[in-house]
Regions:
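Small-residue-rich transmembrane alpha-helices
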Residues: 32, 36, 244, 323-389, ...
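Membrane-proximal extracellular/periplasmic loop immediately following the first transmembrane helix
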Residues: 37-102, 108, 207-214, 223-227, ...
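Generic structural signal for small/hydrophobic residues in well-ordered secondary structure
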Residues: 13, 23, 44, 60, ...
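Hydrophobic alpha-helical transmembrane segments of multi-pass inner-membrane transport and secretion
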Residues: 15-42, 264-300, 327-328, 405-430, ...
Length: 785
């Protein structure tokens, strides 16, 4: 019996091969999208869950207005010990720094993830000494390090690394490996290769560390986080409050540090998952609509099977076998799509898992979808199975509600397609606006920078750049605005005309002059720019800083630095510029010719070790190649890097760009599904209504009249879908645009273009099939019937 079911199922799939192929490919895309998106979300939400007591480890950050995520990324060194002494819930607390470093081993330069810790880190994290000594933890011992087993294997193979030396590109003396320690899973935010001792600076006014704590097993986590948030630390003139405790396992997605965000933000991955679910739902409805239409066309066949003794169970098994075969083929093609996109997807999602794991997870998700699809299809199959023999054979049917499911299904698919296209179009328009708007307050088009750690080679490299025909303008000894090197914060609590309810103001300071403003083509609104002849504490503010102070006439106004009372005088105001992530409003910033920290701080801040230049349109590849060749030839041992400012700014939008590509692909898939569904339905309907079309032609109807019957129906469905899709899409995208300080407009022409484009595609998809049916000879049709 099973063999018979399989033969009948295969025969019907081949009979409607076009519809079957469309359904298989549609569901295969849906399977692949949903499986990969679900795997992606699970991967993002399980970072660092492998730690012993991972749910008790927290990262401590301070609320910071104006930062990209509302939190400061660094804390003072004394904070860890203070939390351990003050809160009984804290079992251990430590300071660490995590960054990528460059080391040379046998003349080869390698990038290693460096974890710089204090000795208290062993009370918070599971770091085990496997070989060697703990000399790397001795304070101010910068010539000893520990490496992981994985790193040791990578650098030295099977040889013991103890006693071997490596060379940091940032210091002259070699570094000795004194220990081998355990490594963590790569599925971690702190996936280290090398461990060093962090430096100590017992001053509450300097923040440069990450503070982590481990709570006791009995601690009330919610109560502690609220108590910590309400706690105020006062050390002299320094007041610290509103500390936020973020679980280690949530650091990947819960307001991560801006420079450590994933390639695609979790909220965008979630949107992709929802979109993938909609795609697979469209694909299922697409096939279910075709399947129901085929069941109707096979009504007499099913009735004859019933007359000849087929039971309800056998009819259900017959139909579900056909459906199951199609789902299995869709699953196989879906796995094939996953295999094709796996390398690209692994890089985009930053997966640290094997290919076999992805296949196993994807297969599990696809299996769940297959179960859902069978349950979804069971109702219509049971419904038609239970129809009486008389109603199946009878040709008299009530016109009202006829083909309602088909119309609802097509409308839903069109609605999803229009929504995807509209959202992707608005997103594309917004990203174009951010790259090309004049409201950035600066011109970064065709701008690049050569960055280095000293001024030794600045003049020689500047002369080389000036000699290049590809370079239009050179500005040495300036700091890049995007991804700056060395900007500092100036805090103030005291200024002229301060309102009683005003909050403290923090200003980002840039050591720059007139040539910098001219290079970036920034706008000086009033006053003058600082120069070498300016007074020591003259400062130029941006509009955001003036607004924070509450001034209407800022020129000549003064304010005092918090930690030492040093006064500063405003001599100019520049237009706001957006050099950070576009989701962040312009922050208070200022320009000084020179800025010294003063007070008890002994170091001098400099940001002059860079060269800015502007290259000619379309010459970046050539320009980059020439500069890199020169640097490798003339300065092979110097840390000199080339940075394209436009590319660095584009990294702020990397998540949005990835989401745009994903949504664009899904929009294309959904549109094709809808169009193919309409084409398949029209093909089936034309075959079902051949006799009706022939009779209409005999009674005087021409091809245009017959085309109008079908066009009118699908035009109505398209309009209904648009009435729902456009308002929903507008509401979603308007909310999404609120994340950006510079927003594009949702133009009226966008609606017209999308509607007209989809209408044309639908017209082309149904036009040929209806035209072919309308041009058949009525006599031949009647004879065949």
């Amino acid at each position: 019996m099973i063999t018979h079911y399989l033969k009948v199922a295969v025969r019907n799939l081949l009979k409607y091969r076009t519809q079957s192929l469309i359904s298989i490919l549609g569901m295969a895309f849906g399977f692949a999208c949903f499986a990969l998106a679900s795997l992606w979300i699970r991967h993002e939400m399980t970072y660092d869950t492998f730690h012993d007591g991972a749910d008790r480890i927290y990262r401590i950050r301070k609320e910071e207005k104006g930062s990209a995520n509302g939190l400061g990324s660094v804390t003072p060194y004394p904070l860890a010990a203070y939390l351990k002494e003050t809160f009984p819930e804290v079992e251990g607390a430590c300071n660490l720094q995590f960054y990528e470093s460059s080391y040379k081993v046998d003349g080869m330069e390698m990038k290693l993830n460096e974890l710089s810790i204090d000795s208290a880190a062993f009370s918070v994290f599971d770091i085990r000494l496997l070989e060697g000594s703990t000399d790397f933890l001795i304070p101010r011992q910068s010539d000893k390090v520990a490496i992981t087993r994985r790193c040791a294997q990578r650098l030295f193979g099977n040889e013991s690394p103890i006693g071997k030396t490596i060379q940091s590109v940032y210091q002259k003396d070699p570094i000795t490996i004194c220990a081998v320690v355990s490594e963590w899973s790569e599925h971690s935010n702190l996936n280290y290769d090398i461990i060093t001792r962090t430096y100590e600076y017992d001053h509450w006014g300097v923040a440069s560390w990450n503070t982590y704590i481990r709570l006791t097993p009995q601690a009330d986590k919610e109560g502690f986080t609220q108590k910590l948030y309400d706690h105020v630390i006062e050390k002299g003139d320094i007041k610290l409050e509103h500390f936020v405790a973020t679980p280690l396992t949530a650091m990947r997605y819960d307001r991560p540090d801006p420079h450590k965000e994933a390639n695609v933000k979790l909220k965008h991955v979630t949107l992709f998952t929802v979109a993938g679910a909609l795609v697979i739902l469209c694909a299922l409805l697409n096939y279910l609509t075709l399947f129901i239409t085929q069941i109707r066309m096979r009504g007499k066949e099913l009735a004859l099977r019933t007359v000849n003794g087929a039971s309800s169970r056998s009819l259900f098994a017959l139909l579900i076998t056909e459906y199951l075969i199609l789902l299995i083929w869709a699953w196989l093609f879906g796995m094939l799509f996953i295999e094709i996109v796996f390398p690209w997807f692994k890089e985009l999602a930053e997966l640290k898992v094997s290919r076999n794991f992805v296949y196993a997870e994807s297969a599990a998700y696809c299996f769940l979808v297959i179960i859902f699809a069978i349950l979804l299809s069971a109702f219509p199959i049971l419904y038609y199975r239970k129809k009486s023999l008389q109603s199946v054979i009878s040709t008299q049917k009530d016109g009202r509600g006829k083909n309602l499911f088909r119309k609802v299904s097509v409308t839903f698919q069109l609605m999803v397609s229009i929504g995807f296209i509209f959202c992707a179009s608005v997103m594309m328009k917004q990203l174009f606006h951010l790259r090309n708007t004049d409201d950035l307050g600066m011109d970064i088009h065709n701008v690049a920078a050569v960055t280095m750690n000293s001024q030794t080679h600045i003049d020689a490299i500047s002369d080389f750049l000036r000699s290049m025909p590809e370079v239009e303008e050179v500005a040495p000894r300036h700091n890049p605005l995007v991804k700056p090197r060395g900007s500092m914060m100036l805090g103030t609590k005291e200024w002229d005309d301060k309102p009683a309810d005003a909050e403290d103001v923090s200003i980002t300071i840039h050591q720059e002059d007139t040539s910098f403003v001219n290079f970036y083509r920034m706008t000086l609104l009033e006053g003058e720019m600082v120069t070498a002849s300016s007074e020591k504490n003259d400062i130029v503010l941006n509009q955001a800083a003036v607004k924070a102070f509450g001034w209407h006439e800022p020129i000549g106004k003064t304010f005092k630095r918090t930690h030492d009372g040093e006064p500063y005088r405003v001599v100019g105001v520049v237009k706001d510029f957006h050099a950070q992530t576009p989701t962040l409003p312009a922050q208070p910033e200022g320009f000084m010719y020179e800025y010294k920290l003063g007070g008890n701080f002994s170091f001098y801040f400099s940001e002059k070790d860079n060269i800015l230049f502007r290259y000619r349109e379309g010459t970046w590849k050539t320009c980059k190649q020439k500069i890199e060749t020169m640097l490798q030839t003339e300065y092979p041992d110097s840390r000199i890097e080339l940075q394209n400012t436009e590319e660095e700014y584009a990294k702020f939008l990397s998540s949005e760009n990835a989401l745009l590509k994903l949504l664009g692909s899904l929009a294309l898939i959904c549109t094709l599904l809808s169009v193919f569904a309409i084409y398949s339905l029209v093909s089936l309907t034309c075959g079902q209504r051949r006799k009706e079309i022939a009779i209409r032609k005999v009674n005087g109807a021409n091809v245009k009249d017959i085309l109008n019957i079908f066009v009118r129906e699908y035009a109505t469905l398209l309009i209904l879908a648009s009435i729902v899709a456009f308002p929903v899409g507008y509401a979603l995208m308007k909310n999404w645009l609120q994340n950006y300080t510079l927003q594009t407009s949702v133009s009226a022409w966008l609606y017209v273009v999308i509607l007209f484009g989809i209408a044309c595609v639908i017209a082309l998809s149904i036009g040929y099939r209806v035209w072919k049916a309308a041009n058949e000879n009525p006599a031949d049709v009647v004879k065949s019937e």
